[in-house]
Amino acid sequence: MRISLACLAALCALPAGVMAQDASVHDKPAVRGSIIANLLQDHDNPFLLYPYESNYLLYTWTSDLNKEAIRSYDWAENARKDEVKFQLSLAFPLWRGILGDNSLLGASYTQKSWWQLSNSKESAPFRETNYEPQLFLGFATDYQFAGWTLRDIEMGYNHDSNGRSDPTSRSWNRLYARLMAQNGNWLVEVKPWYVVGSTDDNPDITKYMGYYRLKVGYQLGEAILSAQGQYNWNTGYGGAELGVSYPITKHVRAYTQIYSGYGESLIDYNFNQTRVGVGLMLNDLF
C-alpha cells in the first residue's frame, strides 16, 4: 500500500523540510516481506521513501503506568493509563549495488510515541518518544535450507534515545545484524546486537532488554499474525508483543496489539506492564 503524507502527518509532526510535498512512499515489495528486496527496487523519483518497521496508530490502555520514572514532570501524578501509541518507520536506499547487484547501503528512521491525548487537564503531553535512526548494509538473498529461504541479511549501527535530559534521559547505541527467512506463509526474523558506547543513563538496560529481538509472522488468509520480543536468558527479564491485522481498505488495516513485560519504551525499560491497543496500520510484515 502507498503511505500518503496525510497519514504520516497524522502519525507524527515532522519538519516540513524533511517530508517534502513531492515525496512519496513505496511499499510494494519485490519479495513479500523482504525489506532489502523492496529497497533494491529502482525508481525515478529521488524522494521515494520505503517502509521499514510497521507504521500504525493505536488507542491503548496499560495495566500500570510508570509514574516513578517521570516524577520530575510537573504533570506526572495526573498521568493517565490510556494513551495514543503510534509508530512511524521509513527507510531510504543511499547506494544500491555497493557490494554487488543484491546489496545496498541504506538508512532508516523509526519513531515511536506514547501520547496522553485524553489528558486535557495537562494539555495532552507526550509522555515518551523514542527516536531510532539506523545506518546499515543489506543483502537480498535466496539461500535455501530445510524448506526455508533466507531473504534478508542486514548489518548496521543503531542509535536509540528518547531525546530527554537528566533525570529522564535514556539511550543506547548498538551494532546489530538482522536475518530474515521465509517458509510459505511463515516469516522468522532474528536481530542480535552488541552494545557500544556509554549507557550511563541506563547502565542495566541489557538486564531487561537482552541482546536480541526475535520476530515471527504468519499470514492466515488476509489476516497477519505477528509476535516479537526480547529476552535475557541470564536474568529472566524480557518483553513480548503480539499483533493481529486485517485489511479494511486497500491501504489500511485494522490492528490489535498486546505488549507484556519490560522494555516497551526506553523510559520503561526496567518497568513491567501489559498494554492493549486497537487502531489502524498502514503496513504489516507481509
Curated annotation (Swiss-Prot):
Entry note: cofactor: Binds 1 Ca(2+) ion per monomer. In the dimeric form the Ca(2+) is bound by different amino acids with binding of each Ca(2+) shared with ligands coming from each monomer. The Ca(2+) ion may have a role in catalysis.
Main location: membrane
Residues that coordinate or bind Ca(2+) 1: S123
Presence of keyword Cytoplasm: no
Extracellular topological domain: 63-81, 116-125, 162-170, 196-213, 232-238, 263-271
Keywords assigned by UniProt, alphabetized: Calcium, Cell outer membrane, Hydrolase, Lipid degradation, Lipid metabolism, Membrane, Metal-binding, Signal, Transmembrane, Transmembrane beta strand
Active site: H159, S161
Localization terms from the record: Cell outer membrane
Function: Hydrolysis of phosphatidylcholine with phospholipase A2 (EC 3.1.1.4) and phospholipase A1 (EC 3.1.1.32) activities.
Protein name, entry field: Phospholipase A1
Organism field: Klebsiella pneumoniae
Gene name tied to this protein: pldA
